[in-house]
Swiss-Prot record:
GO biological process: translation
Gene Ontology MF term list: mRNA binding; structural constituent of ribosome
SUPFAM superfamilies: ClpS-like (SSF54736), Ribosomal protein L7/12, oligomerisation (N-terminal) domain (SSF48300)
Gene: rplL
NCBIfam families assigned to the protein according to its UniProt record, in alphabetical order: L12
Family matches, as InterPro entries: Ribosomal_bL12, Ribosomal_bL12_C, Ribosomal_bL12_C/ClpS-like, Ribosomal_bL12_oligo, Ribosomal_bL12_oligo_N_sf
The protein, known as: Large ribosomal subunit protein bL12
Superkingdom assignment: Bacteria
Length: 127
């Protein structure tokens, strides 16, 4: 008997009817003990094992609310200290919803800035 090549096998499949292909697949499942559901589950488990969680290394400090206007001077001083911005830019920040104070900084630096701003009454989020 001649060796069955992949090309010959595919050519033979092309000549089969749909019913014959289904019978072939069922025969292969029975002969080799293949459970289609088990293949699907194990394939997804392999994908899950390959996925690695990347730890975030850069953070942004976002001020949701600067607090009362009675704290305006401490807020301006603190934001100036953190950003180095001038008065005009700080005023624009104070009037901006979800103002980004710092971007692409370490988690430790973001926590430090958050604590400074929360001490003066601001609502801060780290992303």
């Amino acid at each position: 008997m001649a060796k069955l090549t992949k090309k010959n096998f595919i050519d033979s499949l092309r000549e089969m009817s749909l019913l014959e292909v289904k019978e072939l697949v069922d025969g292969l499942k029975e002969e080799f003990g293949i459970d289609p559901n088990a293949l699907f589950v194990s394939g997804s488990n392999q994908d899950n094992n390959k996925i690695q969680v990347e730890e975030k290394t850069e953070f942004s400090v976002i001020v949701k609310d600067f607090g009362d206007s009675s704290n305006k001077i401490p807020i301006i001083k603190t934001v100036k200290e953190i950003t180095g911005f001038g008065l005009y830019d700080i005023q624009k920040l104070l009037n901006t919803p979800d103002a980004v104070i710092q971007e692409k900084i370490s988690k430790e630096k973001a926590e430090e800035i958050k604590n400074k701003l929360e001490l003066i009454g601001a609502v801060v989020e780290i992303q």
